Structure formats: C-alpha cells, structure tokens
Amino acid sequence: GSEMCIRDSNTNNARMRNRGWELSLQYRGKIGKDIHYSIGGSLADATSEVTAYENPTGTNPQDNWYVGKKVGEIWGYKASGLLQTQEEADTYNNTYDLSFLSGQKWMPGDVKYMDLNNDKKINNGNNTLEDMGDMCVIGNTTPRYQYTLNGSISWKGISLSMMFQGIGKRNWSPDLGTVYFWGSGAYAQVTVFNDHLDYWTPENPDAYYPNPYTGAAGSINQFRNKTSQKSDRYMQSAAYCRLKNLTISYDLPNSWSQKIGLSKAQVFFSGENLLTFTKLPSMFDPEAIFTGNDYTSEAGKNYPMNKVLSIGVIVNL
C-alpha cells in the first residue's frame, strides 16, 4: 500500500493592535570660538494588544492569548509578607485551603499569599478570565520608554563624548525553578550570592528572601511552591540606565605630528558599559535577564555585558 503525509496548513488565528511612537532630538551649538558641543536623545514606546483570538472563555489567560490581552502580561499572586511565627503559620494553615499550591503546611518564613476573592482558598479559580481566583496581572515584560541620551563637547583638540541608553519601565518575574534568583533548589548549578544571604530566620524577620528550601528534584517543588510562586512581592523592575560609551580624545598639535611625518594624530580612551543603574539584584544584567545560555534556558542565568576599556592612537599619514 501507499503512504501519504498531509501537513497541516498554517493559518493566521489572531489579530493584534500595535501602537507606538518615537521622538528624536539633536542640538549643536558653540560657545565662543573654541568650544563646540552637542546634546540629543531619543525616546520611544510601543505596546501590543490582542484584538481577535479563538479563546472565548479566556481559558488559562496567563499562558494563552485572549481578546484584550496586553502582550507581555505577568499573572501572579498578591503577597502580604512572610509568616513570622508558628502561631501565625498555624492560623494561616487553618484559615485557608492551600492544597492547590502545596500539600505541605506553611511554616514561619514562607510567603503569605493573599485570598483576593475571599473564598478561603488560594488558587487560580476556574483558570478562566472571569475567574482566576486569587491571581491577577501583576506586571508586564514589554520594554516601555526606551531611550538614549548623548552629548559631546570639544575644546582645542580635546573632546569628550558619551551615550546613555535605558528602559524606563519593564517587569521581570522569576519562575518557580529560577535558582539563579532564589539561591536555593535541587540542582548542582544553584549559585549563592551575597544577596541570597538575606533570607528569613527568626533573627532576621525583615529578610527579603523566604525560606531557602533544598532537596531532591522530585520532592522539592512541594516546598518551593510555598515560597516561589509568581507574586508582587518578588516582582522585579528591569528598568535601567547604562553608560554605553564614554570616549575622551586628544588631537596632537599639527606641529608635533608633522615632525614625525604624520598629517594628523589622535590619542583616545574609550569605555563601554562603565556604569549601570538598576534595581535588579546584583547578579542580574538588565540587558541579559530575559535570555538564558546554552546549558540552561533559565532566564537571567547568563554572562553580564562586559565592561570594555580601550586606549589607542589614530594616525593619518
């Protein structure tokens, strides 16, 4: 008999509306006869929204598209801090049905997720847009207000130029197994940084990080589910401002360069990625946080942008 292979055809199952704008300004001026300067920058913003998609009930809106979804949405829980005492933990366990998240009892140092719909259960409801239980949109990964700032000034052969770039608003939320963020887990590649030492203990009640659970890969999730759900407590701002380039140069006087048979000579110093301003934990680079590496796809577990220092000479014969 003969065999026949039929390939499904590609179809366009969704429509989106993209809106954005961009502004760019540049000004050059002169002070006296020797000082020349310029200053400028750009600012751009764009968002996307789903306007048509075959998901009428909005099933699983945190992972699926639905009409009205803002591209980049992050769904998660609201949290009201960490449980501090065994009495508080017992009350939390006895008051709420937490079985959707974990079969383990909550302990001091675990995250206190909030019951937004007051049904005494912490869950995602029917997992539809109309009933997501205690989950809601807590952030968005879309980079907003991307900008550059540049300036230069020169005086009698000495020049200074610099360029900053950044993003004004962007969110990033660590996943359950993002050990690079949590600093604990089941795998050998768990890396502990100084930031992770600020974890909860009775002596450190105001800690940022919750209980650092570790254990076998097959059993740790039931413990990690008590602390590492996507939540507003651990929502990160991936906004940043970075000095991408700084260059200082000096044009040697013609009388000097001509003595050695050159028509022009310039010495310069250049630096890239010299300064970065961000609220992210110190182990993350804002330009690399949404990508992984060849070994693991874990977001942010990547080499940071290199700082590059250069010194050189440019000559014209």
Predicted stretch roles:
Residues 7-12, 134-137, 231-235, 296-301:
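Extracellular loop and loop/strand-boundary signature of outer-membrane beta-barrel proteins
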Residues 11-17, 21, 28-139, 181, ...:
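Conserved small-residue
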Residues 27-29, 43-49, 155-157, 166-170, ...:
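Transmembrane beta-strands of outer-membrane beta-barrel pores
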Residues 33, 157-160, 255-256:
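Repeated loop/turn-to-beta-strand initiation elements of outer-membrane beta-barrel proteins
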Residues 169-266, 271:
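Extracytoplasmic gating/loop element in the C-terminal half of outer-membrane beta-barrel translocons
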Residues 22-24, 305-317:
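Outer-membrane beta-barrel "beta-signal"
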Residues 25, 39-41, 162, 267-269, ...:
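Membrane-embedded beta-strand positions of outer-membrane beta-barrel proteins
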Residues 1-6:
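Short, small-residue-biased leader/transition segments that mark boundaries at the very start
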